[in-house]
Amino acid sequence: MALHKIQFNKQEFLAAIAANLARLIFSTIRLRMNDRSGFLTSPPEGPRILVFWHNRIPAISIGFLRHYPRRHPTRKGVSVLTSPSKDGDILAGVMANLGMGSVRGSSSRRGSTAIRELTALLESGVDLAITPDGPRGPKYSLGPGAVFLSQKTGIPIMLLHARYHNAIRLKTWDNFAIPLPFSRVDITIDPYMTIDPEATDLESERLRIETLLREEAEKTDLPA
């Protein structure tokens, strides 16, 4: 009898483990939502560009999406920008396990291709999630992609903040945080922000958004 070789994909395996571990942890979390935008209770027509820091990925990918109005007729799901690296392979796999799509790209690799794909997805009505300081930092430094996309497509930006009351902070470039089981996590959704299509000084818009995200993060960060 012929034996068939079993194919083992390390990235897929790690992604499945990470996604299920995240689900398990968040099944015990006391989650508090502060929706200043009305996104959850009165979902808007058309997509939004969701922007949050890289070290808040667990809270947003599990906590926010627990309340995401996926059955509302205006929502067509969420896709996440992930790095075209081996770490990005794992993150894309985690997102897939959690029911999200992904677009592979970064400022240094596949940047223009990813922008075209992101624009096409936005125009199809999909909400897009971007961690503007990923995948390599600097921590709490907002890249220009979200601002550029918002101006190009006319689609508003929605800032997401997460506060962990008890978490493990990893020794990574961004002090990636993982909430402890049975702890509390607060997620705040800011009102929508639009970028003037005629604006020529996108740097001031970038700094405005970076400041809002950074100040909220530094106010709620736990010691590393």
Regions found by a protein language model. Name each.
Residues 2-29, 76, 97, 101, ...:
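Non-catalytic C-terminal accessory region of glycerolipid acyltransferases
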Residues 23-47, 65-66:
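A short, well-structured juxtamembrane/interface segment
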Residues 34-36, 83, 105-108, 190-192:
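Conserved beta-strand termini and adjacent loop/short-helix elements that scaffold enzyme active sites
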Residues 39-40, 69, 92, 146-147:
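Short amphipathic alpha-helical segments and helix-helix/interface helices
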Residues 41-45, 72-75, 122-123:
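Flexible, charged surface loops at secondary-structure boundaries
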Residues 42-43, 67, 121, 216:
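Hydrophobic helix-cap positions at the C-terminus of alpha-helices
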Residues 46-49, 56, 183-185, 191:
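A generic secondary-structure signal marking the coil-to-beta-strand transition
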Residues 47-108:
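Catalytic core of membrane glycerolipid acyltransferases/transacylases, capturing the structured
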